[in-house]
Structures are given as structure tokens and as C-alpha cells.
Amino acid sequence: MVYSYSEKKRIRKDFGKRPQVLDIPYLLSIQLDSFKKFTDQDPTGERGLEAAFRSVFPIKSFSGNSELQYVSYKLGEPVFDVKECQIRGVTYSAPLRVKLRMVLYDREAAAGTVKDIKEQEVYMGDIPLMTDNGTFVINGTERVIVSQLHRSPGVFFDHDRGKTHSSGKVLYNARIIPYRGSWLDFEFDPKDALFVRIDRRRKLPATIILRALEYSTQEILDLFFERVEFKIKKDTLVMTLVPERLRGETASYDIKDAEGTVLVEAGRRVTARHIRQLEKTNTTELEVPVEYIVGKYAAQDYIDPDTGEVLVSANSEISLEDLAKLSLAGIKELSTLYINELDHGAYISDTLRIDPTTNRLEALVEIYRMMRPGEPPTKDAAEALFQNLFFSEERYDLSKVGRMKFNRRLSIPDDEGSGVLSKEDIVAVMKNIIHIRNGFDEVDDIDHLGNRRIRSVGEMAENQFRVGLVRVERAVRERLSLGDLNELMPQDLINAKPISAAVKEFFGSSQLSQFMDQNNPLSEVTHKRRISALGPGGLTRERAGFEVRDVHPTHYGRLCPIETPEGPNIGLINSLASFARTNSYGFLETPYRKVVDGVITDDVEYLSAIEEGRYVIAQANIEVDSEGRMVEEQIACRHKGESTFMRASDIQYMDVSPQQIISVAASLIPFLEHDDANRALMGANMQRQAVPTLKSEKPLVGTGIERTLAVDSGVVVAAKRGGVIDYVDASRIVVKVNEDELRPGEAGIDIYNLTKYTRSNQNTCINQRPCCSVGEPVVRGDVLADGPSTDLGDLALGQNMRIAFMPWNGYNFEDSILISERVAQEDRFTTIHIQELSCIARDTKLGSEEITADIPNVGESALSKLDESGIVYIGAEVKGGDILVGKVTPKGETQLTPEEKLLRAIFGEKASDVKDSSLRVPNSVKGTIIDVQVFTRDGVEKDKRAIEIEEMHIAQARKDLGEEFKILEEGVLSRARNLLLSAGFTEAQIAALPRKDVLVQVIDDETKQTELEQLAEQHEELKADFDKKFEIKRRKITQGDDLAPGVLKIVKVYLAVKRTIQPGDKMAGRHGNKGVISKINPIEDMPYDEQGNPVDIVLNPLGVPSRMNIGQVLEVHLGAAAKGIGNKIAAMLEDQREKGLAEVRNYIKQVYELGDEVQQRVDIDSFTDDELLRLANNLKGGIPVATPAFDGAKEKEIKQMLELAGLPTSGQLKLFDGRTGNEFERPVTVGYMYMLKLNHLVDDKMHARSTGSYSLVTQQPLGGKAQFGGQRFGEMEVWALEAYGAAYTLQEMLTVKSDDVNGRTQMYKNIVDGNHQMQPGMPESFNVLLKEIRSLGINIELDQE
């Protein structure tokens, strides 16, 4: 493998045995691709905004004299960029402008004669835009739209599993689900009649819908039944024989062949042998006794040819009298319905008998009454209602997916067709459900991923947009009919408000639009790849059963079987598997390698769950020889959702990678294959809660996916093009682009601005740090700067800690964690949290609030950190209760005493009519002010601080753009100098030229002169461009802010809090091994090894066996080896000054070559000495290793690594007690584990109440930290005190400490006076109880005696 310059800085040793056929696809593509389809112009009009417009336009007036047509749309440029939107708290969106054409037709002339056409661009609201990282900025906060897994449109056949009826009979049902429109259900009742429901309303006999579709009784019977033909003879009947129909029947008469030989005697059962005999003798007719016809049903109406009277009506039961009538009327032939109990049930026939309707109109009226009970039906209304239900394109749409699923399920050859239902469609569904009831077909598996599809952002946004457009459509149609159209323009017809409101509602408050989980890069990526079954049009938590939540065979390679939340949402919220993607229909697909004649090829094909069922698919870990042939005879594989063994020649596909079944978060867990699934689930979920530490550290034991994840998440800065690093500082990196990657006429400089100390959604700190230096070559995709939780471009969620598995004085009882003081001293788990506190000055009825340093009754010391505008300085260290922004609010006029009036008159207006409402630091917080933003309403005078901030921003913008300009100008000038050199100028001449004169020299060579002129032109353009950019920036910075009504000014203060690790914080490993820190132990008390090195963390060994997450033990061993190798390299580097690099080179080579059949090849010999030194220096802290899930390091390889590191292969060391110096009685497992600090910090949870607010009704203290509430003293706690007989304590708890209003006030006074006594009174909740009993009409009074 070829490594780039920056990749050579640190190479992770990979233990993977399988070749990487397919790289993990871009992780955010599910979001970005979907939204791109929504916003991009689609000439076919099948998706996105284009489809929404085409589905609603043209809008015709009621009279048909005018219409509004859609021509095209375009999205404008957003006003603010993403960062500005976040600071200002506005939505990152672009204006949507639509070109509409209004066509007026001439009433007098022939139809379709155009009188007038007006075209105009109309503004139709703002469309929120997706950022490059797949998020939306809505009102200044980053949000993610989670994809939804919903039931695909189409037709589904199911049964109730015998739960509906007490008899336990299985009742079948069919359901046609459109993309939009009414649901149509068919269902059997316990008596085997077929019923229909529309939109889950009252059920009707299913034949009503057939009558409404203009089928007569006769046609209905012909659709669903075969006929049995009889010829009427004098005393007997002759039946046309279809031998197969006799199977299983008991003969009620002798069955004879054509020669009269008795084949089956009366009373005997007809078997397959008898049928074969009948077929052999070619018997086509059978004589049956007259009684045989009794109980059969007529297949058609029989009419007396003379009188026209109906002798026997279709579907009526035939008796001997009916037969006699037919015989008399001279009818010689009779058809009956072929029905048998076994596989040709009389379902439709029975249904027709309970059908109250006889013709189409009655059926339509019946449907109308069911849909609109209480309304009087008219013929037109009934027809229109039925027509609109399933046959109108405006009201009903199966969608492309729905039509495809519908046709495939009913074996209709074409995948495409109309979006509405046809008569044939409904009949086909009814035929199929009868087919299933007859036992010829199976019901569908509703949890199969072929029946559930993904609805992503773009599609949901399009649906919401269409909802908005439909609302507008009604208004437009009315205006077209009412207004004077000659005066109106398209703009006057369209009101963009409903569209904006629909889109805003979706992005702002839909259940699937979620506040982005921004704890760390992994949590961002996972959130964007989340697939939820909840949300509008999906399931609800309460109604979702076990089957929906369970892992299904079709989840393989599509949804992760591990990563799902614990709790009520388990199984309803899933994560996309690493390689999965959605196809054009929205179904999940996963890639497989094609296998041809037992040879595995590198061709990769994506298969959906439906297609996968048809093939035989082997797993990725089968043994293969050098030519790609499978070694074993019998191969473990999957076929039709079952796991089985098959011959190698039968295999058609093979998995792409062993990691393809799990999600990104699960594939970050090393040795996942050795962990119990429940613990792996916790491990995957807890990695998302890891807080970025102050100094990120890459995991020693990783899985090799860390880099992909860090780059795809967008938190690191990756090079867009190759080149050389030209300039680096803390906030900017400049790359001089390679000549061959330049676009013509370009300056050849890429500038990357870094994000510094910004607040994330979870109040953690986002900060980017450069990880390259000037002069380094870079290639496209190289990491230039690390973000939060990344280290040299690798995801780094925690820290590598030296761990010992042993009990230690009970401090690691029940998963507690004992850590060394050194961990806290070295700031290993110190995190920075940034809080945003806002102070809003409003216009009140009594006057406007004012932000000022002049606050009544506040001493000088409290104002020491404020400037003259009353706003805190940047860099001030503040603690709980300090004033951050001084603000005064006008008070209502109070009655003044004569004395006060006199004083007022003498000393003028005093500030007694305002009260202090300043922004203060919350109680438990202590930190440093890192930024202040002031937003002022347009037209309100800016204070001094706001102007200062503005000037600072302008100066910063000028500096940024100036430097950018300088760099770009230098690029142009250097190319001009090179040109002059090639034209014969000497270096001295060029050096002597002033900068501005370089571009105005005269060269003899014409082509070079032209080139120089082009460069001069480019320089002028750059200058103009710089001025324009600066002007735009300046205007943006100085313009007033669009604040909410009544708000004059907002001051936002950003406070950085540094949190070191302390007892009570929650920590975890990556294998679901979580615990709370119980004690921070002095270094000298920690157990230490023979070299005197103490351990960092002591974990309880009992946490491993019962939890079955053995992966952590293997990680500790491999981590010890990796660290040991690093120590050896460090020692060799110390010696290399004398011995040279040969020893280091050989040792590193040995390490990378270790392992059987390992795919990774690192050619250490090709490294220059400098590259090798840099690599060795980066490996000093330990060599990072990758052990991919299901393809990781074997026990043998871990032992070889331990040997190479010079450590015992048992992985255990002798340890000594730090307190006594005595050796522990047996060796202890010691090694390195990657530990995470989770975002469950004791500082955010600890809380104590003195006095505070009370509930209005019960007068009891509120609960919870946010309300500064108390602790609940519940009934069990009361029982405990009762059991101890602690009467006074109990009385105190239930009265003065809770809801005895007078008692608690009195007690407060007593304590202040130093009189420690209490007088308990009546608890308020007792009065509430009395009131509640009285509300039931029972008078209850308290006898005070």
C-alpha cells in the first residue's frame, strides 16, 4: 500500500485478514444525496421541488377561463453563511423564486383561444439548506432530519394469527396502502364471508365494491368461480367430468367409466389412483342421480323462454322443484358453481347473499353512507365520492414504489403503471386473498425489509412542501374566479405564507427533526445515519409489538443488529449498517461480491432484501485459495432468510466484508466478536456519549475505521486538493496547490479557516488545531487540522489508561472505578464545556428595560467585572452569583410618603423606580468569559460595547480578507516573476522591481506578453473582488439585527468551564463496561509493578465473567503489547544517536510484518531516514493497532506481540501494594484499555435545596434540579420512618419541610432568630383532599376538638 507524506506520520498496524474489496461508502450520503435530489432541478419531474410543482400546477379557475401555469424555479443564494446563522440565531436558508405564467382564455372565441399571457417570478418562501455535513441550521441551532422506516405502499396480505375470534380461527386480510389517499382493506369474518373497509371504517360486504365498479352478479360469479356443467336428462343428470375435481370427495353414487365399469363404489372416498384411472379411460361425462344437484348454486340466471320469468336466479340454491321447473321450461343444460370445502370455498357466493345491494347506484349509496354518515346521499355526490376515493390522481397516488410492489405481489409482469387503482387491480387483490384462503399462497411477512422502505429528508421535505402548495392552490383557485384578472399579476394570486409555514413546521417541530447530538464526531455521524420507525405515518411506541422491534434476517447488511437504544424505543430506532445504501425506490441495499463457478470475483453488486432472497450468499470469512476458489466442499451460507450449508458450486454471491452487518459505532469496538450482544449494544451507545477531552489521544487498540469516520464526520479539515503547506497558524492553514490540479486562470491557493472554541449543542467545546507544518507536501484528502475528539485524523474519543483487574479495598465494588491522582494531575480527562447565557432587554408597558452598569443597590465590588456599558469583560473569571450583564427594569409607580416626595423634590429623580434584573452566573457554575455578542434592534442606538465588538469584527474581517488577498496576490506575482525569468529578465532585475511594477513590464515574446497581461487582469479582478467581499462583510456586521417583536437588545455571554475528573463522574470502556468513579487515590497508594510504574485505574475482575464481554480482556492484553513495543522503540531512539537507525528500522519492520495472512503491507525499507524518525517518534507512546470486527487479531498473534514487546505472554504481572510495598498474592492482568469519560458529570447532577419555589395547588416543593426542587419523600420512605417509630421526624417531614405553609414561614423566622423550634400545622395537601372529596358531593368537615 502506498502512504502519503502525512499518512506516514503514524501507521496503524492492521490485523485484518480479508482483502478490502470495497471502501466504506461516504457515511453521510444518505442525508446529502436525498436532499440534493430535493433541491436539484429534475427535468423528468419525478422528484424534488419540480415534482411538487408539477403535481399541483396548472391551477385552473372554476370557470375554466383562466389558469396559472408553472414554468420553472430557482433557489437564490443564502443571505448569511452557516457560521453567521449560528451566531445570529437565524435559519440557514435560500429564497425560492418560481416563474409562473398566467393564461387568460377568450370566453367568446373557440375553446382554448388564448386572450392574454403574463409571466412573472414569484417569491415562494425560504427553503432551509443543508450544510456540507448533512445538518440544517434552524433558528441558529444545528438539527438533523432522521430518516424514517415506514411500511412501503403496495398491497399486503396478512392474517390475525387467530386472535380476533374466540374460536381461534385464522382470519385473512388484504390491505392496499397508497403513498397518499385512502386505505382499502379486505377481510374475512369467522363465517368466511369477505368484507371491505375503506379507511378503517365500518365494514361492508366486499361485493358492494364490485357492484360499484359496475359488475353484475353474473359477472362477479364468473370472475371468482369455475362452472360445473350438467345436461338434464329424463331421470338423471349427466355431469361434464373434470376428474381432478373429484379428489378427496366421498362418492354418493357409483362412479363408472365410459364402458360402465364401476371404478368407485358409493360411499367410498375418491383417491389419486381413481383419478388416474378416470383420466386413462378418457371419461368426459358422468351420469349422476338427480339428488346430486340439491344444495348446488346456479351459475347464472335461468329464464323461462315463453314467459320471461326468472326460474332460477344466479347464486341461488337449486332444489328438486327448481330442476323440475327447468325441465318443464325445456332448458336442457344447467351450470352450477364449482365449490368444495377444501380449496374452492364459497366465499364470494356467501358474501353476495348478505349483500343488501343489487345494482351500482345502491352500492354507491351504501358506500356514501358509510363514509359520510348522516348526510343525505344524492346520485352525483355518491358517484363523485367513490370516484375520488381510488380513481382520482389528485386524491390518490400509489407512487412508483407502490405500483411496483403491487404489480410484483400480484405477478403482473410490468413494474410500471398508473398511480391510481383500476377495476382489474381491485379484482386481482380479491382473487389473491381468496387464493390464500384456499391455501394456495402464503401471507406476507410485514417486518421483511422488502416491505418497509426508507423515507429520507428530501422526500419528507417534498411532501411538506406539497402540503403547503395544496393550501395555496385553494386560495389561488378562488382568486382566479373572483378577481379582475386583467389587473392581476401572478404575484397577486400567490401568498407564500402557507408554504413557508408548512416547511418551517416540518424543519422546526416535526418529530423527525431532531436537535443534533453533537457530543463528539461519532454521535453526529450516528445521528445522521439513524433510521426511525416512529414519527408521522410510522409506528407509536405503545402500539409497536415485539415482532417489529426484533432483528429480522433481512436486516443483514442493512440495519445494525446491535446498535439501538435501551428502553421504550428498543428496536424502533435503528442504525444504518456500514455499507448499506438506499435504492431509487427507497429500499435498503447491501453490496455482495459476485461468485462465478466457485470463483470469487471483485465485481460488487448491490442487492435489496427482495432480490437477496433468490440467491445463495456465503459469508465473508470463508477460506479461499490464491486464485479466489473456495477451499471447503460445504460452505455456510444464507438462502431465503435461512442459514444452511451448500456446495461451493451453488454459491452465487459472497459478503463484501465481515463488518458489513454492523453499524459504524459497533465497528469501532475492537474484539466485538468476543463480546455478548447486550454489552456490545451498551458499548456502541456509550461511545456516542463520550465527551471530547482537552488533549485527544488515539486508541492504541482500534479497528481501522477511525480515520474514515473522523474525515467523513466533517470535524477535521481535509485537503480539497494536493499541494504544499504554505502557512499555518492557530486559525488558518494555507496550501499552495499543485500546478496539475489547478483550474485555468486560478490563483492556486487554498485557504482553510479553523473553528476556534465554539459551543456545540451539548455544551461541549468544538476547537480545531492544525496538525501539519509549513513545507509539508499534502495530497487530496489528507488531514490538515484535528477537530474535537480526533488525533492526527483518527477518531479519539477517550484516553489509553494503564489498567489492573483486581479488587482494591472495596473501592471497585459494583462496577465502581478507582483511579489514580496522576490521571487528574495530567488533565487526561479534563474537558471544556461552553455555556451560552443570554440577557434580553425588552420594551415593557412601563417603559423599556436598559442594559447598564448603573444598577440600584449593588456595591462596587459586584460591578468590578463589568465595563461602562454594563457588560462583562472577555477573560473575566466568574463564579456563581456574579453579574454578567447589568440590566434594570422599570417598576410600577408606588405610592410615595410625603418624606420621600420631599427628598425627591430636593435631589431630583432617584433610581428607585427601576428594579435590578441583571443576568447572573448560575449558582453551581465557575468559569471564564470567552466571548460576548451584542445584538441590537434596527433603529435602537448601539451602546459603546456593541460598537467596539463591531469594530473588532470589521478589523478581523479586513485582516482575514487582507491576508487572503495578500496570499492570492503573491501567487499571481510569483507566476509573473517566473514568466519574466523565462523571458530573459535576471533575478536581480526582478528583485529590484517594486511589487506593482512586476505586472506592467514589456516582453518581446508576444504569447508571454499576453500571458502577463492576463495575470495583470487577474490581479485587478482580485483587487475588485476583495473590495466587494469586504464591503459585503462590513454591511453584514453593521446592519441591525432582526429580533423578536418587543426585544430591543440581546447580549449573549459565552462562559467556558473546565471540568477535571472527580468522584461521581461516569466512565466506560468500549465493551459496555461502565462505572462511576468512587475514589481518586494518591499515586503512592496505587499498585505498582516491578519497575515501579503504578497503574492508572483499578477495575473489578468480577465485572467480566457474568457480563461475558471478554473483548475488554483481549483489548487490555493487546494494549499492553502495543505500549510495550512503543517503549522499546523509545529506548532504541535513545540509543540511535550512537548506533544509527538500522536497529529501529528492523524492529519496526518486524512489528508490521507480524501475524499470519495479514493483508497490510508496509514497506519500511522505502522510508527515508527522516520519515522513519518521524514515524518512530510518533510510535513512542505505543504502536496503534487495528483489529477489525469479526476479522481481528487471534490469541496467537497477541502472544507474538507480547513477546516482541518483551512482556510475559500470560499478560499478567507481579504487582505490589503501594501502601505496604508487599507483593500481591498472585499475578494480576495489567495492560492498556481505552477509557471514555461520558457526558454524565456529577457537577450537572449534584443539587441541594434550602428553600425555593412551591407547587401552586399542593404547596409542596417542586421536584428536579431545573426547578431548584426538593427530594421526594414518598410513601415507602414514610413506611420506613413509621417502622422505626420516628414520630417527630415524620411529623417534620410531612408538615414544615413540605406543605404546612404557616408552619414553614414561622420556622424560617425562628431559625433566623436563633430559636430552634417548630409548630407544625395543617398540611395544605390535606385541605386539597377535603376539597376533592367535596367535589364528589360528599360534605366532609374537620372536627377541631
From Swiss-Prot:
Protein name: DNA-directed RNA polymerase subunit beta
Keyword annotations from UniProtKB, A to Z: DNA-directed RNA polymerase, Nucleotidyltransferase, Transcription, Transferase
GO biological-process terms attached to the record: DNA-templated transcription
GO terms for MF: DNA binding; DNA-directed RNA polymerase activity; ribonucleoside binding
Reaction it catalyzes: RNA(n) + a ribonucleoside 5'-triphosphate = RNA(n+1) + diphosphate
One GO CC term, this protein: DNA-directed RNA polymerase complex
HAMAP family: RNApol_bact_RpoB
Keyword GTP-binding part of the UniProt annotation: no
One Pfam family of this chain: RNA_pol_Rpb2_45
SUPFAM superfamilies xref list: beta and beta-prime subunits of DNA dependent RNA-polymerase (SSF64484)
EC number(s) per entry: 2.7.7.6
Family designation: Belongs to the RNA polymerase beta chain family.
Native source species: Shewanella sp. (strain ANA-3)
Keyword Transferase: yes
Self-association state and partner proteins as the record states: The RNAP catalytic core consists of 2 alpha, 1 beta, 1 beta' and 1 omega subunit. When a sigma factor is associated with the core the holoenzyme is formed, which can initiate transcription.
Function: DNA-dependent RNA polymerase catalyzes the transcription of DNA into RNA using the four ribonucleoside triphosphates as substrates.
